């Protein structure tokens, strides 16, 4: 009896110890993944901010010049986003220019189409295998930013430093994901996601809504898909399983943009809606051709063991998806404008004789070029009002008709 109780206690302690080890391992994976994701997002945001400091004004000039037709607008949007590594920054610039009257809504929408292509550059960069050089890159970036006297050179150093952090985050996420390959529960879950495209779209959308960055969730997807299955060669997820999640990531980022446009100008809302239509229509189109699309990507991408090339394949799928949808929608840009104008109409006409500011918009105060243009338009509007008031005053003085004074006073109080 005593021996049986001893065995039971030993077994119970063993089970408790195993359960504690399992929980510790799971917590390490969760916090490692979250920590790696945090480093990645911080590095990406820092790199974007530094690039905007170094080249932001030049990119604004390019945007203003290359928007005479939709094709040039697409090129300008893609180039600006690729350089700044931020589709949000490009979108904000475009909205600011529309509000200031520097470009039309179709031109702004074409820039958004280009921004969708430019943002795929992040995924292409992530697909490079530079894990052996991460700490060298971080060190070089730190030294340049630490010893530089010029603000521009310091921004370049910080950009290099942030670039290294971005890959450090990716490397951290990859390291903590490796134990998941041996988990039967997790592999069964992944098999379900891989075989049900709609579920993959839902997972991708939810991930982007939570993280608030499609570049970050696509980086997680690339990293996760690069984890080997039981045979050590094939991907846990596979390209056909990754594409629906990729489509969901694209939908998630449009919902984020829609939420961000609440309380903004009508043009900001129209731009967000156009972005939403672009990605949702793409998802609805591509979801029916996941396997043929995956086969095409595998054909045009580098060959090799799946776990080594799938990150590049996902990046290529992301790029080809956005290029295809841009080619479709740039031909239908007038139709897109009609849709967004119908969904968000102009409403009542602007009262140009109002005593309150008409063109000033504090939402674009951080864009000096666009804000100054709005100030100039407001000054011209008020100048016209002053000219009318002065002319009416001179008429009243000459005619001595005091009955004309009351309408003039009312005009000044509007």
Q: Which residues does each predicted region cover?
A:
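Helix-loop-helix hairpins and the membrane-proximal interhelical loops
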Residues: 24-70, 160-206, 224, 234-235
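Hydrophobic core segments of alpha-helical transmembrane domains in multi-pass membrane transport
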Residues: 32-45, 77-81, 138-148, 162-173, ...
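Non-transmembrane accessory domains of multi-pass membrane transporters/channels
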Residues: 323, 330-414
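Short, Lys/Arg-enriched N-terminal segments with co-localized hydrophobic residues
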Residues: 4, 8-22
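Membrane-interfacial helix-loop connectors
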Residues: 81-84, 92-118, 124-133, 144-145, ...
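C-terminal ends of transmembrane helices
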Residues: 44-53, 94-99, 141-154, 257-263
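Transmembrane alpha-helical segments and their short flanking loops
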Residues: 170, 177, 181-193, 230-236, ...
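Alpha-helical transmembrane segments of multi-pass membrane proteins, especially transporters
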Residues: 57, 61, 65, 69, ...
């Amino acid at each position: 009896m005593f021996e049986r109780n001893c065995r039971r206690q030993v077994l119970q302690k063993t089970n408790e110890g195993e359960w504690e080890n399992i929980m510790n391992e799971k917590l390490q994976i969760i916090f490692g993944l979250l920590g790696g994701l945090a480093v990645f997002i911080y590095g990406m945001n820092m790199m974007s901010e530094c690039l905007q400091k170094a080249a932001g004004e030049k990119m604004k000039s390019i945007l203003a010049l290359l928007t005479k037709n939709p094709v040039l607008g697409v090129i300008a949007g893609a180039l600006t986003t690729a350089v700044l590594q931020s589709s949000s920054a490009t979108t904000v610039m475009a909205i600011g220019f529309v509000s200031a009257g520097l470009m039309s809504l179709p031109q702004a929408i074409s820039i958004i189409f280009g921004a969708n292509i430019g943002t795929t550059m992040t995924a292409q960069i992530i697909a490079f295998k530079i894990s052996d050089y991460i700490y060298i890159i971080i060190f070089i970036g730190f030294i340049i930013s630490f010893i530089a006297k010029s603000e521009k050179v310091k921004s370049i150093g910080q950009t290099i430093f942030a670039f290294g952090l971005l890959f450090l985050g990716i490397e951290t996420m990859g390291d903590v994901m490796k134990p998941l390959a041996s988990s039967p529960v997790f592999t069964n879950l992944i098999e379900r996601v891989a075989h049900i495209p709609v579920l993959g779209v839902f997972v991708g959308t939810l991930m982007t809504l939570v993280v608030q960055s499609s570049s970050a969730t696509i980086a997680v997807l690339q990293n996760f898909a690069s984890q080997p299955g039981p045979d050590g060669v094939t991907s846990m997820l596979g390209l056909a399983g990754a594409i629906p999640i990729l489509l969901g990531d694209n939908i998630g980022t449009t919902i984020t943009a829609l939420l961000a446009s609440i309380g903004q100008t009508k043009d900001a809302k129209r731009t967000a809606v156009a972005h939403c239509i672009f990605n949702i229509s793409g998802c609805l189109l591509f979801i029916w051709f996941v396997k043929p699309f995956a086969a095409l990507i595998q054909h045009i991408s580098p060959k090799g063991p799946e776990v080594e090339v799938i990150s590049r394949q996902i990046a290529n799928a992301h790029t080809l998806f956005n290029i295809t949808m841009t080619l479709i929608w740039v031909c239908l840009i007038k139709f897109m404008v009609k849709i967004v104008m119908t969904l968000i109409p102009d409403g009542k006409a602007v009262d140009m004789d109002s005593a309150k500011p008409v063109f000033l918009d504090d939402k674009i105060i951080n864009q000096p070029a666009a804000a100054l243009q709005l100030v100039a338009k407001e000054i011209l509007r008020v100048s016209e009002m002053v000219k009318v008031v002065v002319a009416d005053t001179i008429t009243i003085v000459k005619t001595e008709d005091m009955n004309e004074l009351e309408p003039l006073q009312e005009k000044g109080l509007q």
